[in-house]
């Protein structure tokens, strides 16, 4: 059997004991498929439900296919929709009208080892993870219809996270930030975000806990944020937010048994396992199922999106800090995982405040499944691995 590794520019013929490895290095994509699957030049990996693949031992995939114990927590059942419920702007889920159009709140959250486990994941509509300073990553959790009793630890702003918050005209909650974010980006985008910086007089929603050391102990919650929105005169709701295309769940019979995804970061491996019954992906951090300490729920996503984006270093704005800068305005490669399938396509963000849109290989916008959206921004060249069940 002949196998090929695709680098995005050329193919190399190799032999790996009957297992075909398909790689697109330029897009940062590595897919493991059975012989007889997609392997022709220019083709994209198969997304056929029910496709099977083998666990293998390979230098390219060290320990990535080891089974993980089942989670101790199961996803909580959704509330029964009322007759007046409508679709939420951010994730397309059904919610009461006052929540479905509530002012989005984008909160910067720490990913230092001392900050884990973080709170708020299970209540967020959209979660972004991207490289930040010091070789660490950082999150911005965007809330709309969900209510969180704890969110945090809250950390500082970065310009590219501001651009993501600006997509939703969101309140942007953070503890300070780098010079470019505070002096250049945020003032220029005040028409598209509402700034709530603890270090600049906006401290009403934040508190520190005694069980963690600074700077990993600042928290907020939905109730405190809503109180501050009223106090600062910000609008409680929006009616005309830009929205993505959404679709309803596929029938159970059309969903594959499972799918596994691995997204490596410098701070650890993020992985997802598709759950056929709930049509969602259970999230793991460092090989362990992630539970939200705010409510004990297993963290899950209905959609997992990987954005391959250029990461450079800014050594000019703040000499000596050498902060990473993620180029999230423009266009690039993307993989959209939903309902146990993988769609290889393109992301496009036309401006600092424009919504990031996702397109398939034919140029059509990709409709997402209604519910939580987790967006993993990784440097171009990152090997993102996935396996069908």
In which residue ranges do the predicted regions lie?
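Hydrophobic membrane-insertion alpha-helices, especially the h-region
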Residues: 16-28
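Hydrophobic single-pass membrane-insertion segments
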Residues: 27-42
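A surface/extracellular/periplasmic glyco- and lipid-processing/surface-interacting theme
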Residues: 2, 11, 50-56, 65-71, ...
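N-terminal Sec-pathway targeting helices
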Residues: 5-19
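A general structural signal for well-ordered secondary-structure junctions
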Residues: 22, 36-39, 191-192
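Intrinsically disordered, low-complexity segments enriched in small/polar and acidic residues
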Residues: 41-47, 54-57
């Amino acid at each position: 059997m002949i196998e090929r590794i695709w680098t995005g520019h050329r193919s190399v013929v190799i032999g790996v004991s009957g297992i075909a490895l398909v790689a697109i290095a330029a897009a940062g994509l590595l897919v493991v498929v059975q012989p007889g699957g997609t392997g022709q030049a220019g083709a994209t990996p198969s997304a056929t439900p029910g496709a099977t693949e083998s666990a293998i031992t390979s230098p390219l995939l060290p320990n990535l296919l080891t089974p993980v114990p089942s989670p101790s927590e199961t996803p909580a059942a959704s509330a029964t929709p009322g007759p007046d419920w409508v679709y939420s702007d951010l994730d397309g889920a059904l919610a009461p009208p006052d929540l479905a159009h509530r002012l989005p709140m984008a909160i910067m959250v720490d990913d230092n080892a001392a900050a884990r486990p973080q709170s708020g994941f299970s209540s967020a509509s959209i979660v972004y993870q991207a490289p930040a300073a010091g070789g660490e990553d950082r999150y911005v959790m965007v809330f709309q219809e969900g209510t969180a009793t704890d969110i945090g630890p809250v950390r500082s702003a970065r310009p590219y996270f501001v651009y993501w918050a600006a997509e939703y005209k969101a309140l942007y909650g953070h503890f300070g930030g780098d010079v470019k974010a505070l002096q250049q980006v945020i003032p220029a985008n005040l028409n598209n975000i509402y700034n709530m910086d603890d270090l600049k007089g906006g401290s009403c929603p934040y508190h520190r806990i005694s069980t963690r050391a600074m700077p990993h102990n600042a928290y907020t919650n939905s109730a405190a944020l809503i109180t501050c929105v009223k106090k600062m005169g910000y609008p409680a709701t929006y009616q005309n937010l830009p929205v993505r295309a959404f679709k309803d769940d596929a029938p159970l019979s059309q969903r594959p048994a499972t799918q596994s995804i691995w997204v490596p970061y410098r701070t650890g491996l993020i992985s997802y396992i598709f759950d056929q019954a709930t049509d969602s992906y259970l999230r793991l951090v460092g090989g362990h199922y992630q539970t939200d300490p705010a409510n004990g729920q297993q963290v899950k996503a209905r959609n997992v999106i990987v954005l391959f984006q250029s990461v450079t270093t800014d050594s000019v704005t703040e000499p000596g800090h050498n902060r990473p800068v993620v180029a999230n305005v423009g266009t690039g490669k993307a993989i959209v995982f939903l309902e146990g399938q993988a769609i290889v396509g393109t992301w496009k963000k036309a401006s600092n405040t424009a919504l990031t849109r996702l397109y398939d290989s034919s140029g059509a916008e990709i409709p997402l499944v209604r519910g939580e959206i987790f967006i993993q921004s990784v440097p171009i060249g990152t090997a993102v691995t996935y396996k069908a069940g």
